[in-house]
Amino acid sequence: MKSLLFCCLFGTFLATGMCLECEICIGLGLECNTWTKTCDANQDTCVTFQTEVIRAPVSLSLISKSCGTSDTCHLNYVETSPHNELTVKTKRTCCTGEECKTLPPPVLGHKVNPPNGLQCPGCLGLSSKECTEHLVSCRGSENQCLSIIGKEFGLFFRALSYKGCATESLCTLFEKRFWNVLEDVEVDFKCTPALPKSSQ
Protein backbone atom coordinates (compact mmCIF):
# COMPACT_ATOMS: atom_id res chain seq x y z
CA MET A 1 0.00 0.00 0.00
CA LYS A 2 2.82 2.40 0.85
CA SER A 3 4.53 1.76 -2.47
CA LEU A 4 1.25 2.32 -4.35
CA LEU A 5 0.59 5.62 -2.56
CA PHE A 6 4.16 6.82 -3.11
CA CYS A 7 4.11 5.85 -6.76
CA CYS A 8 0.78 7.53 -7.45
CA LEU A 9 1.75 10.73 -5.62
CA PHE A 10 5.15 11.04 -7.24
CA GLY A 11 4.68 9.03 -10.44
CA THR A 12 5.07 12.09 -12.64
CA PHE A 13 8.68 12.35 -11.50
CA LEU A 14 9.56 8.73 -12.29
CA ALA A 15 11.52 7.89 -15.40
CA THR A 16 8.89 5.33 -16.36
CA GLY A 17 6.03 7.75 -15.87
CA MET A 18 3.75 5.04 -14.48
CA CYS A 19 3.15 2.67 -11.55
CA LEU A 20 4.54 -0.75 -12.48
CA GLU A 21 2.67 -3.88 -11.43
CA CYS A 22 4.23 -7.35 -11.46
CA GLU A 23 3.18 -10.91 -10.74
CA ILE A 24 4.63 -12.26 -7.48
CA CYS A 25 5.09 -15.92 -6.58
CA ILE A 26 7.49 -18.66 -5.58
CA GLY A 27 6.98 -22.38 -6.05
CA LEU A 28 8.24 -25.75 -7.24
CA GLY A 29 8.37 -26.69 -10.91
CA LEU A 30 7.83 -24.37 -13.86
CA GLU A 31 4.63 -22.65 -12.67
CA CYS A 32 3.42 -20.96 -9.48
CA ASN A 33 0.24 -19.29 -8.23
CA THR A 34 0.72 -15.55 -8.67
CA TRP A 35 -0.71 -12.39 -7.18
CA THR A 36 -0.22 -8.84 -8.42
CA LYS A 37 1.86 -6.27 -6.59
CA THR A 38 2.48 -2.57 -7.22
CA CYS A 39 6.24 -2.24 -7.29
CA ASP A 40 8.29 0.24 -5.30
CA ALA A 41 9.17 3.52 -6.97
CA ASN A 42 12.72 2.42 -7.79
CA GLN A 43 11.64 -0.89 -9.35
CA ASP A 44 11.06 -0.62 -13.08
CA THR A 45 10.82 -4.20 -14.36
CA CYS A 46 9.26 -7.58 -13.60
CA VAL A 47 11.65 -10.50 -13.12
CA THR A 48 11.18 -14.26 -13.44
CA PHE A 49 13.74 -16.59 -11.83
CA GLN A 50 14.05 -20.23 -12.95
CA THR A 51 16.28 -22.21 -10.60
CA GLU A 52 17.72 -25.73 -10.81
CA VAL A 53 19.12 -27.42 -7.71
CA ILE A 54 21.26 -30.29 -9.02
CA ARG A 55 22.68 -33.22 -7.14
CA ALA A 56 23.34 -35.73 -9.89
CA PRO A 57 21.41 -37.61 -11.04
CA VAL A 58 18.55 -35.73 -9.29
CA SER A 59 17.49 -32.13 -9.96
CA LEU A 60 14.81 -29.89 -8.44
CA SER A 61 13.21 -26.98 -10.31
CA LEU A 62 11.88 -23.81 -8.67
CA ILE A 63 10.32 -20.66 -10.09
CA SER A 64 9.78 -17.21 -8.62
CA LYS A 65 8.46 -13.89 -9.91
CA SER A 66 8.99 -10.44 -8.43
CA CYS A 67 9.57 -6.75 -9.02
CA GLY A 68 13.13 -5.76 -9.89
CA THR A 69 15.41 -3.14 -11.35
CA SER A 70 16.40 -3.09 -15.02
CA ASP A 71 20.05 -2.38 -14.22
CA THR A 72 20.41 -6.06 -13.22
CA CYS A 73 18.67 -7.59 -16.26
CA HIS A 74 22.01 -8.27 -17.95
CA LEU A 75 22.89 -10.54 -15.00
CA ASN A 76 20.67 -13.23 -16.46
CA TYR A 77 22.64 -16.28 -15.29
CA VAL A 78 24.06 -17.10 -11.86
CA GLU A 79 25.53 -20.24 -10.36
CA THR A 80 26.74 -21.34 -6.94
CA SER A 81 28.07 -24.56 -5.38
CA PRO A 82 28.00 -25.12 -1.59
CA HIS A 83 29.16 -28.73 -1.96
CA ASN A 84 31.17 -30.76 -4.48
CA GLU A 85 28.04 -32.76 -5.31
CA LEU A 86 25.53 -29.89 -5.25
CA THR A 87 25.09 -27.01 -7.72
CA VAL A 88 22.42 -24.30 -7.86
CA LYS A 89 21.86 -22.50 -11.18
CA THR A 90 19.44 -19.65 -11.88
CA LYS A 91 18.42 -17.96 -15.11
CA ARG A 92 16.43 -14.71 -15.10
CA THR A 93 14.29 -12.81 -17.59
CA CYS A 94 12.96 -9.25 -17.34
CA CYS A 95 9.77 -7.82 -18.84
CA THR A 96 7.19 -5.05 -18.46
CA GLY A 97 3.52 -4.69 -19.38
CA GLU A 98 1.96 -6.93 -22.03
CA GLU A 99 5.31 -8.52 -22.82
CA CYS A 100 5.14 -10.41 -19.51
CA LYS A 101 2.02 -12.27 -20.67
CA THR A 102 3.72 -13.84 -23.69
CA LEU A 103 7.37 -14.07 -22.66
CA PRO A 104 8.30 -17.74 -22.13
CA PRO A 105 9.93 -18.63 -18.80
CA PRO A 106 13.73 -18.91 -18.75
CA VAL A 107 15.03 -22.39 -19.54
CA LEU A 108 17.91 -24.10 -17.75
CA GLY A 109 19.66 -27.32 -18.67
CA HIS A 110 20.57 -30.01 -16.17
CA LYS A 111 24.26 -30.05 -17.16
CA VAL A 112 26.78 -29.44 -14.36
CA ASN A 113 29.83 -27.39 -15.39
CA PRO A 114 33.31 -28.93 -14.91
CA PRO A 115 35.71 -27.78 -12.14
CA ASN A 116 37.77 -24.68 -13.00
CA GLY A 117 40.73 -25.09 -10.62
CA LEU A 118 39.45 -22.64 -7.98
CA GLN A 119 38.27 -23.47 -4.48
CA CYS A 120 36.20 -21.98 -1.64
CA PRO A 121 34.94 -22.91 1.82
CA GLY A 122 31.50 -24.47 1.48
CA CYS A 123 28.61 -25.42 3.76
CA LEU A 124 24.84 -25.16 4.10
CA GLY A 125 22.88 -24.82 7.33
CA LEU A 126 19.09 -24.61 7.31
CA SER A 127 17.45 -23.06 10.38
CA SER A 128 20.90 -22.14 11.66
CA LYS A 129 23.29 -19.20 11.39
CA GLU A 130 26.29 -21.54 11.50
CA CYS A 131 27.48 -24.47 9.39
CA THR A 132 30.54 -26.73 9.27
CA GLU A 133 32.90 -25.72 6.46
CA HIS A 134 34.66 -27.97 3.94
CA LEU A 135 36.55 -27.09 0.75
CA VAL A 136 34.51 -26.98 -2.47
CA SER A 137 35.81 -27.13 -6.05
CA CYS A 138 34.40 -24.22 -8.06
CA ARG A 139 32.81 -24.92 -11.45
CA GLY A 140 32.40 -23.11 -14.75
CA SER A 141 32.45 -19.34 -14.26
CA GLU A 142 32.30 -19.52 -10.45
CA ASN A 143 35.22 -17.31 -9.37
CA GLN A 144 33.94 -15.85 -6.08
CA CYS A 145 33.58 -17.23 -2.55
CA LEU A 146 30.12 -16.33 -1.23
CA SER A 147 29.14 -16.25 2.45
CA ILE A 148 25.51 -15.68 3.49
CA ILE A 149 23.78 -15.40 6.85
CA GLY A 150 20.03 -14.92 6.57
CA LYS A 151 17.00 -14.89 8.84
CA GLU A 152 13.22 -14.56 8.73
CA PHE A 153 12.50 -16.73 5.69
CA GLY A 154 8.79 -16.94 6.47
CA LEU A 155 7.26 -20.31 5.56
CA PHE A 156 10.62 -21.85 4.67
CA PHE A 157 12.92 -21.57 7.72
CA ARG A 158 13.89 -19.07 10.37
CA ALA A 159 17.58 -18.87 9.53
CA LEU A 160 20.13 -19.82 6.88
CA SER A 161 23.91 -20.08 6.75
CA TYR A 162 25.59 -20.67 3.40
CA LYS A 163 29.12 -20.69 2.01
CA GLY A 164 30.32 -21.77 -1.40
CA CYS A 165 31.61 -20.86 -4.85
CA ALA A 166 29.60 -18.34 -6.86
CA THR A 167 29.60 -16.42 -10.12
CA GLU A 168 30.41 -12.73 -10.03
CA SER A 169 26.90 -12.05 -11.35
CA LEU A 170 25.38 -13.58 -8.20
CA CYS A 171 27.49 -11.34 -5.97
CA THR A 172 26.30 -8.32 -7.96
CA LEU A 173 22.67 -9.39 -7.52
CA PHE A 174 23.14 -9.62 -3.77
CA GLU A 175 24.56 -6.09 -3.82
CA LYS A 176 21.33 -5.01 -5.56
CA ARG A 177 19.14 -6.78 -2.96
CA PHE A 178 17.35 -8.89 -5.55
CA TRP A 179 15.37 -11.05 -3.06
CA ASN A 180 12.35 -8.70 -2.78
CA VAL A 181 9.97 -11.57 -3.66
CA LEU A 182 10.43 -12.47 0.05
CA GLU A 183 9.91 -9.08 1.65
CA ASP A 184 10.74 -10.02 5.25
CA VAL A 185 14.04 -11.74 4.50
CA GLU A 186 17.13 -10.26 6.16
CA VAL A 187 20.45 -11.20 4.55
CA ASP A 188 24.08 -10.40 5.31
CA PHE A 189 26.52 -11.48 2.61
CA LYS A 190 30.14 -11.19 1.57
CA CYS A 191 31.98 -12.11 -1.63
CA THR A 192 35.74 -12.58 -1.93
CA PRO A 193 37.84 -13.87 -4.87
CA ALA A 194 38.18 -17.65 -5.05
CA LEU A 195 41.73 -19.02 -4.74
CA PRO A 196 43.54 -21.70 -6.77
CA LYS A 197 43.53 -25.10 -5.09
CA SER A 198 47.26 -24.91 -4.45
CA SER A 199 46.74 -21.69 -2.44
CA GLN A 200 44.26 -23.17 0.02
UniProtKB/Swiss-Prot annotation:
Optimum pH is 4-12. Important decrease in activity at pH 2. Keywords: Disulfide bond, Phospholipase A2 inhibitor, Secreted, Signal. Gene3D superfamilies: CD59 (2.10.60.10). It is found in: Secreted. Residues 1-19 form the signal peptide. It comes from the Eukaryota. Expressed by the liver. One of its GO terms (molecular function) is phospholipase A2 inhibitor activity. InterPro entries: CNF-like_PLA2_Inhibitor, LY6_UPA_recep-like, PLipase_A2-inh_b-type, PLipase_A2_inh_N, Snake_toxin-like_sf. The keyword GTP-binding does not apply. The keyword Secreted applies. Optimum temperature is 4-90 degrees Celsius. Weak decrease in activity at 100 degrees Celsius. Pfam families: PLA2_inh (PF02988), UPAR_LY6 (PF00021). One of its GO terms (cellular component) is extracellular region. Disulfide bonds join C22-C46, C25-C32, C39-C67, C73-C94, C95-C100, C120-C145, C138-C165, C171-C191. Inhibits the enzymatic activity of all phospholipase A2 tested, binding with micromole to nanomole affinity. Belongs to the CNF-like-inhibitor family. Heterotrimer of 2 subunits A and 1 subunit B; non-covalently linked. This is Phospholipase A2 inhibitor NAI. It comes from Notechis ater (Black tiger snake).
